[in-house]
Each structure stands twice: as structure tokens, then as C-alpha cells.
Amino acid sequence: MESPVKEHREGTLIRVRVNPDADTTDLKGVDEWRGVLEVDVAAPPVKGKANRELLEFLGRKLNTTCELVSGEKSREKLVLARDVSVDEVKERLGLR
């Protein structure tokens, strides 16, 4: 199984699969086959709304700034969580 979180010189990279237009915004868990963190996002995938909601949600959960590295128009995204370690991300997201 590939972990959805990897160390990066500026923090931690998180591979995410987004399910937009969900009832609520919440973590669904890890898709072990794809090696991604599954996240439901209530916002629709229109004009970057789902991306903004994803980054704000992860930023609150991780208590840091998150930014989109790739996947702006895809369900699979790479997010950089700045200035937090892999262990901190795993702990704060309940991935242990």
C-alpha cells in the first residue's frame, strides 16, 4: 500500500481524491488501492469552489496553510500542507 502522505522540503504532500457536491465536507478515509486520501466536499466543482473548500477544510484540520500543487481540474489532487511533518499530518487526520 502506498501512503497518501509524503515528506516534502516545505511540509507534507498529500494525495487526495475529491468527491464534490457531497452532503457534507468530511474525510472518508484512505483508498489503499489508489494510495489517496478520500475527501467529500459539499461545494460543487464550479469555478474552483470545490478546490477552495478542500484547501480550507484541510487547513483547519491540519492547522496550517494548504495549497494545490496539481489537479486543479481533476478529482485527484496533490496538496502541500506547509510546515507540518508527515507524522503530524497522519495524527491530525487520524491516519495512524
UniProtKB/Swiss-Prot annotation:
Cited InterPro entries: DUF167, YggU-like_sf
Q: List the disulfide bonds.
A: none
Q: Name one Pfam family in it.
A: DUF167
Q: Name one GO cellular component term.
A: cytoplasm
What PANTHER family has UniProt attached to this entry? UPF0235 PROTEIN C15ORF40 (PTHR13420:SF7)
The entry's family comment says:
Belongs to the UPF0235 family.
Q: What is this protein called?
A: UPF0235 protein MK0273
